[in-house]
């Protein structure tokens, strides 16, 4: 769809596609006619294929865009590799830094939600470690604490920023009830929320609460279903494939559309000088910068 739109804009694009499964020898695929003429290759899906494909692209000055969740660090040593996927540790560090930057004047309140799996423990532990290093005081409370004990964790003189240790919807909704009770019993407390990317899935029914508590959600994408450009693309998708977009976040089809538009436009505009930096951006993404 992205290539079709670019063609209507006057660009000439030739597309080749290869179905390369996990057991395929990528070296054999690279010997096929036409591969060496590519300006950009999107893939691979499997980590073991990254190194030979990256080496091939480097030797022929072909851009390699890896949008999938692979392991490896070719992006650090190969200037022709663009690795879109970021591992959990990198995203956690980015979220911690975003918190420290935006809430330096706030009082952090960590709420234990009694989630036995607790997949967000890595984030809360990393954030608390940085707060300790910086000498920032914070309080810890529990979602099941009595109202008076819960309230003691909150500052009456500073804005409070609440961090839950889970991204699950039931616990989030229970936290909203707890915060509303706090507001009733102790009016005047300023409360904000720092959440998780998963919370974007709850926006359709939690939007009012998100606004009420000035919620910040760290994310590498944003799907705006109300945007005219997004609605136009979704209509076109239904026309092409006779079904709506998969209900997932991010919308994978829009991710692919954004990637194709960004890299193809960039290469056509800047040629071998294209590095993908912000000064070369000539496309406004719909969802994924």
Q: Model segments located where?
A:
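Extracytosolic ligand-binding ectodomains
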Residues: 1-289
């Amino acid at each position: 769809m992205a290539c079709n739109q670019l063609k209507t804009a006057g660009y000439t694009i030739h597309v080749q596609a290869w179905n390369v499964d996990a057991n395929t020898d990528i070296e054999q695929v690279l010997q096929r006619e036409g591969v060496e003429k590519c300006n950009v290759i999107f893939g691979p899906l499997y980590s073991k294929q990254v190194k030979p494909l990256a080496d091939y692209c480097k030797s022929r000055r072909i851009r390699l865009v890896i949008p999938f969740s692979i392991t490896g660090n070719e992006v650090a040593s190969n200037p022709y590799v663009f690795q879109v996927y970021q591992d959990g540790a990198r995203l956690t560090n980015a979220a911690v830094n975003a918190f420290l930057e935006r809430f330096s004047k706030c009082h952090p309140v960590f709420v234990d939600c009694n989630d036995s799996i607790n997949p967000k423990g890595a984030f809360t532990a990393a954030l608390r470690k940085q707060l300790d290093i910086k000498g920032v005081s914070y309080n810890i409370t529990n979602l099941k604490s009595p109202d008076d004990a819960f309230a003691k964790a909150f500052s009456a003189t500073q804005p409070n920023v609440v961090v839950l240790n889970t991204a699950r919807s039931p616990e989030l909704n229970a936290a909203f009830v707890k915060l509303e009770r706090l507001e009733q019993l102790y009016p005047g407390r300023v409360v904000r929320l720092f959440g998780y990317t998963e919370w974007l899935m709850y926006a359709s029914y939690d939007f009012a609460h998100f606004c009420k508590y000035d919620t910040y959600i760290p994310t590498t994408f944003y799907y705006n279903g109300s945007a005219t450009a997004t609605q136009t693309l979704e209509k076109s998708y239904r026309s092409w494939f006779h079904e709506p977009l998969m209900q997932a976040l991010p919308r994978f089809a829009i991710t692919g559309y954004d990637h194709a538009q960004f890299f193809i436009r960039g290469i056509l505009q800047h040629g071998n000088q294209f590095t993908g930096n912000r000064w070369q951006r000539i496309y406004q993404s719909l969802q994924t910068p």
